[in-house]
């Protein structure tokens, strides 16, 4: 299960960083413009530790994504059958 947690954090990290770059927004400008501490953003993009849902939600909204859009990106990023229990 620990491995799945890591995969999830890494998927969130990749999506957040890619979407910010796709918008052409510099790291510091993104954080300052959306009142997101750089340490919080660092934790998310480096998949360093569990980040609160509030902080992830704040970043998702700052990226101008709906939660549905973010979920779709997450589904594409995660391996097939990601949460399926072993039989």
Question: PLM ranges: what are they?
Answer:
Residues 1-23:
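A short, Lys/Arg-rich alpha-helix, primarily the initiator
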Residues 23-43:
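Short alpha-helical DNA-recognition segment
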Residues 20, 31, 60:
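The alpha-helix within a helix-turn-helix
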Residues 20, 45, 55, 74:
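DNA major-groove recognition helix of helix-turn-helix
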Residues 48-61:
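Short, basic-rich loop-to-helix N-cap that marks the start of a DNA-contacting helix
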Residues 1-3, 71-87:
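Short, charged recognition helix plus adjacent turn
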Residues 17, 28, 39, 57, ...:
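Residues within the helices of the helix-turn-helix
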């Amino acid at each position: 299960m620990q491995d799945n947690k890591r995969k999830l954090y890494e998927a969130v990290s990749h999506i957040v960083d890619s979407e910010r770059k796709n918008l052409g927004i510099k790291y510091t400008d993104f954080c300052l413009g959306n009142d997101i501490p750089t340490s919080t953003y660092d934790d998310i993009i480096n998949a360093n530790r569990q980040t609160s849902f509030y902080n992830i939600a704040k970043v998702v909204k700052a990226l101008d994504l709906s939660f549905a859009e973010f979920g779709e990106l997450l589904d594409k990023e995660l391996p097939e059958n990601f949460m399926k229990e072993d039989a």
